[in-house]
A protein has these predicted regions:
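Extracellular/periplasmic carbohydrate-active domains that bind, remodel
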Residues: 2-392
Length: 392
């Protein structure tokens, strides 16, 4: 994993070093008609600037200067002739009416761009109205992800602040060699389905040095995700870092080679979680490493849930997802529930190869009840000091 992490960092670093080595041609969105007054629709200006830059034979830079720019759905298509840079010094805001982007699935989407750097600035999707619609049980649009990378390769996303997404803040799908660095993601703890970063069907993904405070998973890792390195994340509020949910279909792709390290979880619903539906599936989750983690009053610091069902109409079968080779090392802190370690695995496909090493999790309880471990259909071993006492 160390070699993969180094290669990813080196590749994406080359993208922003190029502009230091050769002149970059700037495409200022204001020159294409954008106005940073917060209420003039600048969507067409942004699209024209992107289109011109994408056709450029010089090293292009789409530039958003200081100001507040109202934009509707932005579909930024490749492939482009050169590596692209998209630099935001201002703030992008969505229309106040959530329907303006709510039916588009994505607010800002980069599609089939190979060699892309997105820097800085703030995007604010103004999701409050959409969340109210969802909570009120009304007929609502599907909701939009704030920024999505689809079929993109060699991508750097750095320094972005994402506020109040209708749904997922940052999405990565069918992409490779993507580095997300020093982003800040914020939405209220009660905002529904506002995952911070969601990765699916992608490989070679690094997420580093970021603060994620939201209403759902800080980071969610979906089927088909391979070779991920997640480090120095401040997570909370939210639902923790989750692999899954998995097992929604029989022919689902697996998840493998994931590392989560040197991160802090504060008052989250879960810490590190693997979740799968209780139904047949050919999926798997294997070669997973969770190390050097601090839990601060976290609901379930260590959790495998193979009977995942957050709502009604649960399948109530046996999960076909095979969970194996999972290591938890140097995980310390406090749990807000008594079950600090919970492995609720499949009867037909027990979890195997679980390793607990140097764990110290105490129950944050005014009655001083000790933390406990719960295991069902889980097989593994322990090393060093493990608190609470391991099932293995």
């Amino acid at each position: 994993m160390a070699n993969f992490k180094t290669m990813t960092h080196t590749s994406v670093s080359l993208l922003f070093l190029l502009c230091l080595l050769r002149p970059c041609l700037a495409y200022n969105v204001v020159s294409f008609g954008a106005r940073g007054d917060g209420w003039t629709d600048s969507t067409s200006a942004f699209l024209r600037a992107w289109s011109a830059a994408c056709r450029s034979t010089s090293q292009p830079n789409v530039y958003v200067p200081r100001g507040t720019y109202l934009v509707r759905t932005l579909n930024l298509y490749g492939p482009c002739r050169r590596r692209m840079e998209f630099r935001i010094d201002g703030t992008l805001v969505a229309p106040a009416n959530y329907n303006a982007i709510g039916n588009s699935e994505f607010w800002i989407m980069f599609y089939k761009v190979s060699g892309l750097s997105v820097y800085g600035g703030t995007i604010n999707a103004k999701g409050h109205g959409y969340w109210s619609c969802r909570k009120g049980g009304k007929s609502c649009p599907q909701g939009a992800r704030s920024i999505q990378f689809m079929w993109c390769n060699n991508v750097l996303l750095k320094g972005l602040t994402s506020l109040h997404s209708q749904r997922v803040h940052v999405g990565i799908g069918y992409s490779s060699n993507v580095r997300v660095e020093k982003v800040k993601i914020t939405a209220p703890s009660g905002s529904p389905n506002t995952d911070g970063i969601h990765v699916q069907n992608s490989r070679g993904i690094t997420i580093y040095g970021s603060i994620i405070q939201t209403g759902d998973d800080c980071i969610s890792i979906g089927p088909g995700s391979m070779n991920m390195w997640i480090e120095q994340i401040g997570c909370g509020p939210g639902h923790g870092i989750s692999i899954g949910s998995l097992g929604s279909s029989n022919n689902e792709a697996g998840v493998a080679n994931i590392t989560v390290t040197n991160s802090v979880f504060t008052k989250t619903q879960n810490g590190v979680r693997i979740k799968s539906w209780a139904r047949p599936s050919g999926g798997y989750a294997r070669n997973l490493m969770f190390t050097n983690l601090i839990m601060r009053n976290v609901g379930y610091p260590i959790l495998i849930d193979q009977n995942y069902c957050p709502h009604n109409n649960c399948p109530r079968q046996n999960s076909g997802v095979k969970v194996s080779q999972v290591t938890y090392k140097n995980v310390k802190g406090t749990s807000s529930t008594q079950q600090a370690i919970k492995f609720d695995c499949s009867y037909s496909n027990p979890c195997t190869g679980i390793r607990l090493q140097d764990i110290k999790l105490t129950h944050n309880d005014r009655f001083r009840r000790p933390a406990v471990s719960y295991c069902r259909n889980a097989r593994g071993r322990r090393g060093g000091t493990v608190i609470p006492r391991s099932c293995f």
